[in-house]
Amino acid sequence: MYALALLASLLVTALTSPVQDPKICSGGSAVVCRDVKTAVDCRAVKHCQQMVWSKPTAKSLPCDICKTVVTEAGNLLKDNATEEEILHYLEKTCAWIHDSSLSASCKEVVDSYLPVILDMIKGEMSNPGEVCSALNLCQSLQEYLAEQNQRQLESNKIPEVDLARVVAPFMSNIPLLLYPQDRPRSQPQPKANEDVCQDCMKLVTDIQTAVRTNSSFVQGLVDHVKEDCDRLGPGVSDICKNYVDQYSEVAVQMMMHMQPKEICVMVGFCDEVKRVPMRTLVPATEAIKNILPALELTDPYEQDVIQAQNVIFCQVCQLVMRKLSELIINNATEELLIKGLSKACSLLPAPASTKCQEVLVTFGPSLLDVLMHEVNPNFLCGVISLCSANPNLVGTLEQPAAAIVSALPKEPAPPKQPEEPKQSALRAHVPPQKNGGFCEVCKKLVIYLEHNLEKNSTKEEILAALEKGCSFLPDPYQKQCDEFVAEYEPLLLEILVEVMDPSFVCSKIGVCPSAYKLLLGTEKCVWGPGYWCQNSETAARCNAVDHCKRHVWN
């Protein structure tokens, strides 16, 4: 009923203009269809509905309010409210208006034109803007744009340019700036060219100096670029920020390892005797197929960069494992050891630190249990892919290595399975993937979530990202992604709360195939020589006395 009261108020605003001269009916659609009162007087309601009021409308507050009220009025009619009841209520609403003249006008409008308006509402429930145009509360979009252009021409002022409209065409011209397709018709003056080159080199030098001397400069620059991303609109803004997060660090590193002259030559501000080789530009129609509509996310770090850091990771891992072995010998508590591992993980670079923390949270107790049974620390670093495996140790520690590898999220090649004793390691088999393609789409979706969600995200945040994540994948994957999320959402949500490693998550829920894997069993005698030979009692219990005498105790 509140909606009807608001509708009555809008009717007063729209229809209290003076009665028009009958000659106005010959003035054409623009005049006849300016409001419902004129259209009724000229008997042109149907004509106005078809030719004028049904056209797109400009966005405005009165128009939006009117559309809401008309929609609510239509809902009341659907609830079987009679026209007499609505008319009586509107007349009572008019009586509440304090201004006596407005109250009388309101009642006159309701009595005279409400049946026409209600008929329009019944017939055009899907387009409330048509009714609001008849009430002169919504303006035609075509008319609005024409008025704007005319006003700009008459003002004789230079309009302010929206930066967001300038950025996009500028970005599209960057390839032509880097690799011009045609030589300039006239060579620039040497002096001017030298000035531009010197200015470019000075700018790059100043930026490099600021990066070295001011620790907050890079972050400030990144924040400034993200502010510019906000001006690109809701859809492009998130993609822009995602690119900045992925590639800003790599871009700064590249700039710091290049000479200013080299950078300025690349962007075309400085000349070089040996010209920079030009790349063949891909036509825009072809390039956009690879970039849009999905802007596929890629890892910001190349594989060879990670491999170059493996030596450092290996040394750090060996140092940490040796220290933990010493603490175990000194009877340190498990809580103290876990804290020590967590601190060690935090000292690693970002990619390795995140992986280290995930492995620690999920499998920390199992790793410590293996260390307590005198497994070589260097070998342990090998099986978690931070060091190259030592071939001399593989033969003697094959079973515990297989157990550790199966507990880690990363899946190396499965080890050879030894002959199973009566009590052996538990066997687990991941069911084959369903629908033949969920493995690939699962990994792409988890990669998207990994890049766009903060660490320790809540279930609600992960669920919201899942619901819209499929729309950011390439077209061939979107339908399949929707089916995948619909089928696996509950299980996927439970795992993503704990870990977001694509290979681990997709294997865990069973959409990516995997070989039989050995899991760390409850029977300790399957842990291998590191456990069998710790003392004679354990060796006897595991039937390994002869083995320990030949290979360990000699």
UniProtKB/Swiss-Prot annotation:
Superkingdom of this entry's organism?
A: Eukaryota
Domain annotation Saposin A-type: ranges: 18-58, 518-554
Q: Quote the InterPro entries the UniProt record gives.
A: SAP_A, SapB_1, SapB_2, Saposin, Saposin-like, Saposin_chordata, SaposinB_dom, Sphingo_Act-Surfact_Prot
Which cysteines share a disulfide bond?
A: 63-138, 66-132, 94-106, 197-270, 200-264, 229-240, 314-387, 317-381, 345-356, 439-512, 442-506, 470-481
Q: Which organism is it from?
A: Rattus norvegicus (Rat)
Upper taxonomic lineage: Eukaryota, Metazoa, Chordata, Craniata, Vertebrata
Ranges of residues in domain Saposin B-type: 59-142, 193-274, 310-391, 435-516
Propeptide residue range(s): 17-59, 143-193, 274-309, 390-434, 517-554
In its UniProt record, which GO terms are filed under biological process? Answer: adenylate cyclase-inhibiting G protein-coupled receptor signaling pathway; antigen processing and presentation; cellular response to reactive oxygen species; ceramide metabolic process; cerebellar Purkinje cell differentiation; cochlea development; corneocyte development; cornified envelope assembly
- Protein's recorded name: Prosaposin
Q: How does it assemble?
A: Saposin-B is a homodimer. Prosaposin exists as a roughly half-half mixture of monomers and disulfide-linked dimers. Monomeric prosaposin interacts (via C-terminus) with sortilin/SORT1, the interaction is required for targeting to lysosomes. Interacts with GRN; facilitates lysosomal delivery of progranulin from the extracellular space and the biosynthetic pathway.
Role of this protein:
Saposin-A and saposin-C stimulate the hydrolysis of glucosylceramide by beta-glucosylceramidase (EC 3.2.1.45) and galactosylceramide by beta-galactosylceramidase (EC 3.2.1.46). Saposin-C apparently acts by combining with the enzyme and acidic lipid to form an activated complex, rather than by solubilizing the substrate.
Q: What is its main location?
A: other
Glycan attachment positions: 80, 214, 331, 456
The record's GO molecular-function terms, alphabetically, read: G protein-coupled receptor binding; ganglioside GM1 binding; ganglioside GM2 binding; ganglioside GM3 binding; ganglioside GP1c binding; ganglioside GT1b binding; identical protein binding; lipid antigen binding
**Localization annotation:** Lysosome
- Cellular component terms (Gene Ontology): aggresome; cytoplasm; extracellular region; extracellular space; late endosome; lysosome; membrane
First and last residue of the signal peptide = 1-16
Which segments cross the bilayer? none
Alphabetical UniProt keywords: Disulfide bond, Glycoprotein, Lysosome, Repeat, Secreted, Signal
Q: Which Pfam families match?
A: SapA, SapB_1, SapB_2
